[in-house]
Amino acid sequence: MRQWTAIHLAKLARKASRAVGKRGTDLPGQIARKVDTDILRKLAEQVDDIVFISGTNGKTTTSNLIGHTLKANNIQIIHNNEGANMAAGITSAFIMQSTPKTKIAVIEIDEGSIPRVLKEVTPSMMVFTNFFRDQMDRFGEIDIMVNNIAETISNKGIKLLLNADDPFVSRLKIASDTIVYYGMKAHAHEFEQSTMNESRYCPNCGRLLQYDYIHYNQIGHYHCQCGFKREQAKYEISSFDVAPFLYLNINDEKYDMKIAGDFNAYNALAAYTVLRELGLNEQTIKNGFETYTSDNGRMQYFKKERKEAMINLAKNPAGMNASLSVGEQLEGEKVYVISLNDNAADGRDTSWIYDADFEKLSKQQIEAIIVTGTRAEELQLRLKLAEVEVPIIVERDIYKATAKTMDYKGFTVAIPNYTSLAPMLEQLNRSFEGGQS
């Protein structure tokens, strides 16, 4: 009776929330969890395979690629594709999407929510994308966070799918007897190098890791004299092109994708790894990968007549560097709109922008840079310190700032942080209404 009441109240809450113009992703789960504290555990027990996707960057793209590919092959799933990746949002997804025929759940999970959610749900597999500095006022230092995750997931029989090229992710191998590695061959692609490194110290002994090849930041082929090393990958990208969309060679199979950004190659590979471990073959994966387009502000493309735009979320130095690199891959003039909010969900500490490589903008052909959000003036200062000699316009209203980019001929590169994403994406959809997206 308690479970029935929880589910029905949650569904009513969803309808009410949407009726007043909200998404209704967290509220149903919050209400259900108060009525029945075991609701998530009960619903999860009805599913055969539960896949958790976590990491600092790339969770949403990886999760959506997996979800889209399964649906493209007529496989029913539970999927929190609206991005609500904490306990309440995950509970909402199970309540709204569970059916007797649904036997797979694809769940994006916030790194900080892993200890709480794993008290209620044990996934059959977890894939980790990467670990970078991100809102450390929420989680503490990366080493502490990774150690906490390892302790939480240990001895639970979870199959771990790990990015072999990230030593932070690879160290999670201590938490399971069943490990599958994915990675990228040396020289598969020439990533832009950054001066930002998370840590290149061995998690076993503390010595400086030796790198045979670096893709970017701490991502690459590494080893230590104590024996810790980059493991051999079962699933591997041998080469790829990006112009600006990805053309991947994974395990000698080609994938012509509709997502941009070289950093998304790792996200596609993480998704591929999950799908292969779920039993899909190359052709079924190709059916999904080659029909996937972003509609959630992650490398999302817009076009109307001669005006083009692309938006990509950036909430830490690595994400910002990746977004700024997109502009370098685009020919001709650009206009940037960059937003920085410091709301609770963003993390109050915005000092990470000083670790991002804004200096690279000085090499691009830029008509103007519009800075917006609650910390617009701090962005303006950061750009001045980077000696970016283009007009820098401050417009704190995100809607107005985004709309203003339509006054310029150049390609709009829109870079919001977390709570800036919804208003910036909404305005781009308005501005490009009737066009291509």
UniProtKB/Swiss-Prot annotation:
Disruption phenotype: The gatD-murT double mutant shows abnormal peptidoglycan composition, with decreased amidation of the glutamate residue. The mutant has a normal morphology but growth rate is greatly reduced. Mutant shows reduced antibiotic resistance and increased sensitivity to lysozyme.
ATP-binding among keywords: yes
Root EC class: ligase
Residues the record lists as binding Zn(2+): 202, 205, 224, 226
Catalytic function, reaction form: beta-D-GlcNAc-(1->4)-Mur2Ac(oyl-L-Ala-gamma-D-Glu-L-Lys-D-Ala-D-Ala)-di-trans,octa-cis-undecaprenyl diphosphate + L-glutamine + ATP + H2O = beta-D-GlcNAc-(1->4)-Mur2Ac(oyl-L-Ala-D-isoglutaminyl-L-Lys-D-Ala-D-Ala)-di-trans,octa-cis-undecaprenyl diphosphate + L-glutamate + ADP + phosphate + H(+); beta-D-GlcNAc-(1->4)-Mur2Ac(oyl-L-Ala-gamma-D-Glu-L-Lys-D-Ala-D-Ala)-di-trans,octa-cis-undecaprenyl diphosphate + ATP = beta-D-GlcNAc-(1->4)-Mur2Ac(oyl-L-Ala-gamma-D-O-P-Glu-L-Lys-D-Ala-D-Ala)-di-trans,octa-cis-undecaprenyl diphosphate + ADP; beta-D-GlcNAc-(1->4)-Mur2Ac(oyl-L-Ala-gamma-D-O-P-Glu-L-Lys-D-Ala-D-Ala)-di-trans,octa-cis-undecaprenyl diphosphate + NH4(+) = beta-D-GlcNAc-(1->4)-Mur2Ac(oyl-L-Ala-D-isoglutaminyl-L-Lys-D-Ala-D-Ala)-di-trans,octa-cis-undecaprenyl diphosphate + phosphate + H(+)
Record EC number: 6.3.5.13
GO biological process annotation, one example: regulation of cell shape
GO molecular function: acid-amino acid ligase activity; ATP binding; carbon-nitrogen ligase activity on lipid II; zinc ion binding
Active-site residues annotated for this sequence: 349
Keywords, comma-separated and alphabetical: ATP-binding, Cell shape, Cell wall biogenesis/degradation, Ligase, Metal-binding, Nucleotide-binding, Peptidoglycan synthesis, Zinc
Pathway: Cell wall biogenesis; peptidoglycan biosynthesis
Pfam families from the UniProt entry: Mur_ligase_M (PF08245), MurT_C (PF08353)
InterPro entries documented for this protein: Lipid_II_synth_MurT, Mur-like_cat_sf, Mur_ligase_cen, MurT_C
SUPFAM superfamilies: MurD-like peptide ligases, catalytic domain (SSF53623)
Stated family: Belongs to the MurCDEF family. MurT subfamily.
Known partners and oligomeric status: Forms a heterodimer with GatD.
Biological role stated in the UniProt entry: The lipid II isoglutaminyl synthase complex catalyzes the formation of alpha-D-isoglutamine in the cell wall lipid II stem peptide. The MurT subunit catalyzes the ATP-dependent amidation of D-glutamate residue of lipid II, converting it to an isoglutamine residue.
Protein's name in the database: Lipid II isoglutaminyl synthase (glutamine-hydrolyzing) subunit MurT
Protein's organism: Staphylococcus aureus (strain COL)
Taxonomic placement: Bacteria, Bacillati, Bacillota, Bacilli, Bacillales
